[in-house]
Amino acid sequence: MFDKFPNSQVDRAPESISQSKEYYVRAFEGSADRASKRYPKLPYHHPGHMEDVMQAVGELVKLLPGDGYPRVITPWQKDLLALAAAWHDAGFDDKAARAYPTKEEYAIALMKEDLKSNEIDLTSSDIAFLDRAIRGTIMVPALQQRDTPEAKLLHHADMAYMTADWETFWRGAEAFHDEEHPDILGELPEV
């Protein structure tokens, strides 16, 4: 998932990123594994949703125009987007999340703690990129922050099931409905 950026990308990275490509692949994969353990086991929000969003964001980046990909999202940023996708709903139903204005801010705090405690060496610019991407998944209209390419891409990846084939869409819609409205018994009507 993370082995996308060329070696020269790390060589051109800011001096504070002093590790090798292999280091980042291992570090990001480890971080994504730890993120998956922070996901609840709800009908919609669960580790499978994390994996779906990670895959969808990679597919969306591939859809960018050929001349737009390097300018809008670099290969390094594509890997950062996959990492943001891994953390975007981490801790979704933790009681501690209630102390934050949004569950996305809690997910960002969890991600930053993971990066720090595992000594994953990223620049402040990279951390800000991850932060903006995750904030792009905020659903409350008054709090939405989708004014950057990374925020827009992660938001659309988070909602990708809505544009999938009918079976995938319906499965996602039912899971989301069951999670959001557990008090309403029964399945959605057949269409």
Model-derived features: positions:
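Active-site flanking loop/helix segments enriched in acidic
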Residues: 27-56, 90-96
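Eukaryote-biased recognition of C-terminal alpha-helical segments
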Residues: 23-24
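His-Asp-centered metal-binding catalytic motifs of divalent-metal-dependent phosphohydrolases/nucleases
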Residues: 53, 76-96, 107, 130-138
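Histidine- and acidic-residue-rich, metal-dependent catalytic cores
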Residues: 53-57, 104-144
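Hydrophobic/aromatic-lined pockets within catalytic cores
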Residues: 91, 95, 112-120, 161
